[in-house]
Design a protein with these regions (language model features):
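Soluble extramembrane regions of membrane proteins in the secretory/endomembrane system
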Residues: 21-183
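Bacterial N-terminal signal peptides
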Residues: 11-22
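Bacterial N-terminal signal peptides that target proteins for export
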Residues: 1-12
Length: 183
């Protein structure tokens, strides 16, 4: 018995046929060897403080979760709080994913706390026309803390810088000079 298709059945059959042809004509997925690696970009264009700290740490954490090939941490900062800087450095050093610290664009700087962050990266890069350094610790408000306390703070900052400059194979004397020299 030959039965005619209803308009609904005919429309359904046409949709299925269309989808079958669309799927067949689709480009095949690339082999796993051709999948492009993911690089997570995080821009720190701010003073180093708790909000920017959380932003950077979240970006590094995300890169680790998705097994990214790398994190590109673009820096343009005058520096900031030591506590936030140390937390960012700790996140960089403990990351399973390599972190590339990059001072950019031209005209940017990674001064003070930014210098520590720059040198903590697995790879530290600077665009032409950028600068870094001036990482000598200063007190907020310029309070006089006395020579002994000032020396202790400077020695602690220099030891901290030395610890990851050595780990990353950087010029330790130059890194330490960025902390100890005041001018």
């Amino acid at each position: 018995m030959n039965r005619r298709l209803t308009p609904v059945e005919l429309g359904f059959a046409a949709c299925l046929t269309f989808l079958a042809f669309r799927l067949a004509a689709r480009e095949p997925l690339p082999p796993a060897s051709e999948v492009r690696p993911v690089v997570v970009e995080v821009d720190l264009d701010d003073v180093v403080q708790p909000v920017s700290e959380e932003y950077v740490k979240r970006g590094i954490s995300y890169a680790n979760q998705v097994n990214a090939a790398a994190v590109l941490l673009e820096l343009s900062t005058p520096g900031g709080l030591e506590s936030s800087m140390r937390n960012i450095v700790q996140a960089i050093i403990s990351s399973r994913v390599p972190v590339i610290t990059y001072v950019a664009p031209s005209g940017s700087r990674a001064a003070s706390a930014g210098f520590f962050i720059l040198l903590s990266g697995d790879v530290a890069v600077m665009s032409p026309g950028t600068n870094t350094g001036a990482a000598h610790p200063v007190m907020i408000g310029g309070a006089d803390i006395g020579k002994t306390m000032e020396a202790k703070i400077e020695n602690d900052a220099a030891a901290y810088m030395r610890s990851f400059a050595e780990k990353r194979g950087r010029n330790v004397q130059l890194a330490e000079a960025g902390v100890r020299e005041r001018e």
